[in-house]
Amino acid sequence: MSALNKIVKRSSSQPTETDLLVAQCLYDLESSSKDMAKELRPLQITSAREVEVGGGKKAIVVFVPQPLLKAFHKCQARLTRELEKKFADRHVIFIAQRRILPKPGRKSRVTQKRPRSRTLTAVHNAILEDIVFPTEIIGKRTRQATDGRKTIKVFLDNRDANTVDYKLGSFSSVYHKLTGKNVTFEFPVATGEGL
């Protein structure tokens, strides 16, 4: 078994250098760590991309097949920590590979309805959930400026503020790169109303 077996690609496309690097790291972790080997053996990736985060830093976005997402979630905290050790100064983010089906036009003869999970809105919301995974999204607000620009303000759970706080810039840059939408992440300020 080699690192190439960790990559699921269509036969027409060749794996990139980043794909091979991430796959090799997954394979090395599987072979070196006995306690993680059982969890890592069935896991595969579809692709990996480096995204410019700002300030000269980069993040690695690892795309995984949709059916394997739950298996990745089981060991994601430890896997992310190990991969971030190997890729110094880069944040690692796991996102499921999803497909957006176009909205059927007036002249298209479709035989079945487009599933909700394949709409643009559903895919973008799912990407947002994947990016912040260990943390839960508590609320969202869409702010529209007078010049027409929209900014999504996402409120995250306060319990994970210490573990995720330093990654918020990476999260917003990756989401903007993948979807084209501006987003800011915040932790809600606790007020003393219940006292």
UniProtKB/Swiss-Prot annotation:
The protein's assembly and partners? Component of the small ribosomal subunit (SSU). Mature yeast ribosomes consist of a small (40S) and a large (60S) subunit. The 40S small subunit contains 1 molecule of ribosomal RNA (18S rRNA) and at least 33 different proteins. The large 60S subunit contains 3 rRNA molecules (25S, 5.8S and 5S rRNA) and at least 46 different proteins. Interacts with snoRNA U3. uS11 interacts with MPP10. Component of the ribosomal small subunit (SSU) processome composed of at least 40 protein subunits and snoRNA U3.
What PANTHER family does this protein's entry cite? 40S RIBOSOMAL PROTEIN S7, SMALL RIBOSOMAL SUBUNIT PROTEIN ES7
Question: Which family, according to UniProt?
Answer: Belongs to the eukaryotic ribosomal protein eS7 family.
* Keywords (A to Z) from UniProt: Cytoplasm, Nucleus, Phosphoprotein, Ribonucleoprotein, Ribosomal protein
Q: Where in the cell is it found?
A: Cytoplasm; Nucleus; Nucleus, Nucleolus
- Its domain of life? Eukaryota
Its Gene Ontology molecular function terms? structural constituent of ribosome
Phosphothreonine is found on T146, T151
Q: Name one GO biological process term.
A: rRNA processing
Q: Which gene encodes it?
A: rps7
> What is the protein's given name?
Small ribosomal subunit protein eS7
Q: Which GO terms describe its cellular component?
A: cytosol; cytosolic small ribosomal subunit; nucleolus; nucleus; small-subunit processome
Taking the record's annotation, the residue ranges forming a coiled coil are none
Q: What does this protein do?
A: Component of the ribosome, a large ribonucleoprotein complex responsible for the synthesis of proteins in the cell. The small ribosomal subunit (SSU) binds messenger RNAs (mRNAs) and translates the encoded message by selecting cognate aminoacyl-transfer RNA (tRNA) molecules. The large subunit (LSU) contains the ribosomal catalytic site termed the peptidyl transferase center (PTC), which catalyzes the formation of peptide bonds, thereby polymerizing the amino acids delivered by tRNAs into a polypeptide chain.
Q: By its UniProt entry, which InterPro entries does this protein fall under?
A: Ribosomal_eS7 (IPR000554), Ribosomal_eS7_CS (IPR047861)
Which Pfam family would be a valid example here? Ribosomal_S7e
Q: Which organism is it from?
A: Schizosaccharomyces pombe (strain 972 / ATCC 24843) (Fission yeast)
Positions carrying Phosphoserine are S172, S173
